[in-house]
Swiss-Prot record:
Annotated site location: Stabilizes the phosphoryl group: T51, K109
Disulphide bonds in the chain: none
Site (Contributes to substrate recognition): R108
Organism expressing this protein natively: Aneurinibacillus thermoaerophilus
Protein name: D-glycero-alpha-D-manno-heptose-1,7-bisphosphate 7-phosphatase
Known EC number: 3.1.3.83
Length: 179
């Protein structure tokens, strides 16, 4: 039997968007994230994070710093009884990357690479899955991969001008939208 997944962008969906968050002291969970993820976990969704991390490519922080923050974030979720299936990240940037990080990548949203990797790794039925992002590139990745429901979290100006998909203004709206 195939799994269904809730795909989540990180910055701007799981945590408050700040410029290139890479330190624990700068990481602030979005209001309602724990309750929302707990609900979807209880409904049998795999919880998968897909995040572009151009700050690595630009040299603002290292992959090691990303992993330290990521491990802390996952432990905070676990304290709340929430288990993230996997975090996929893309450190590359085609224009502003430095050294080995300056390249295009099929994993970099709006490309669907991270979603398609997870589909294969966890036997995911994308037609029964949901993606939540806060930028058009998130939604494009979901659509290109064949994710059935793509939702823009328009808690900021990025989502307000888009006519691409369903919109929510708070994470609590996600639960009622899917019911």
């Amino acid at each position: 039997m195939k799994n269904k997944a809730l795909f989540l962008d990180r910055d701007g969906v799981i945590n408050v968007e700040k410029n290139y968050v890479h330190k624990i002291e700068d990481f602030e969970f979005m209001d309602g994230i724990f309750e929302t993820l707990r609900y979807f976990q209880e409904k049998g969704y795999l919880l998968i994070i897909i995040t572009n991390q151009a700050g690595i490519g630009r040299g603002y922080y290292t992959e090691e710093q990303f992993h330290i923050l990521n491990d802390w974030m996952l432990s905070e979720f676990e304290k709340e009884g929430i288990y993230i299936t996997k975090v996929y990240y893309c450190p590359y940037h085609p224009e502003h990357g430095i050294g080995k990080y300056k390249r295009d990548s099929f994993d970099r949203k709006p490309n669907p690479g991270m979603i398609l990797k997870s589909q294969k790794e966890f036997n995911i039925d994308l037609s029964k899955s949901i993606l939540v992002g806060d930028k058009e590139s998130d939604i494009q990745a979901g659509k290109r991969a064949g994710v059935n429901v793509n939702i823009i979290f328009s808690n900021n100006k990025n989502g307000d001008e888009l006519d691409c998909c369903k919109k929510i203004n708070s994470l609590s709206e996600l639960v009622s939208l899917i019911l």
